[in-house]
């Protein structure tokens, strides 16, 4: 009968490095990126938005005509080899106007969301961290602004400032400030009593340093998600203001304005309405897909 001998224990040498699979720290941002890559809808949305960004950048290379160039002899011509998306009631090439309109829509989305993000995040940080009467004052202002439908408040602001694309951009930024503000405020309130914040205060760290070095970095996930979703909302609101004649003015190729100018030809020349409307739908859908994917990746608790 064979006797089994116990295998000797392998003790690591004092200076030997730990195994490769031990103490492996995975960055939460890297893990979120991995989850995002697995989300097929988010990838589709990213492809859509990237396509429109490239179209906006290389607009002069995609078409040789001007978006304001008129040709009455080509009035309301259907899609053809010469005019891919047809022409409008002034004989202007709709494809050219769609391409240059992508620039306007993306610029409005970027600047409106950036403005709302900066002011909303700042106010949310102040209200959530300091609390007391400062929080009460800022929160009441947010509540009053959110009591009105965003598009109605934007219309009122543009009516005061005057109809133009710049004023529409300002109005869209203003109506989105409380959305970012309340989001950041709620996140700050949940963080300010955490142990690492209390430890920073105990070490004598100044409030500004605590806010920007500890609280803000830990609040980035919901801010990024809201900013992505806000892009689509801002573009849709700009199109609505343009449709009402309060946004971009002729001859600027803003998609909402194109819809407004062509609504009387919806039966006789449906292409004049179809392509601008389809462009708005695609861009908004693309940003919503990316936003939903980011939300699921950065905050799995919110996954429905």
From Swiss-Prot:
Membrane spanning stretches: 41-61, 108-128, 141-161, 164-184, 227-247, 271-291
GO cellular component, one term: plasma membrane
Bilayer topology term: Multi-pass membrane protein
Entry's localization field: Cell membrane
CDD domains attached to this UniProt entry: TM_PBP2
GO biological process, one term: protein transport
Keyword Transport set for record: yes
Occurrences of domain ABC transmembrane type-1 (ranges): 102-291
Chain residue ranges for the region called Disordered: 1-24
Its job: Probably part of the ABC transporter Dpp involved in dipeptide transport. Responsible for the translocation of the substrate across the membrane.
Protein name (database record): Dipeptide transport system permease protein DppC
Protein species of origin: Alkalihalophilus pseudofirmus (strain ATCC BAA-2126 / JCM 17055 / OF4) (Bacillus pseudofirmus)
Name of the gene this protein is made from: dppC
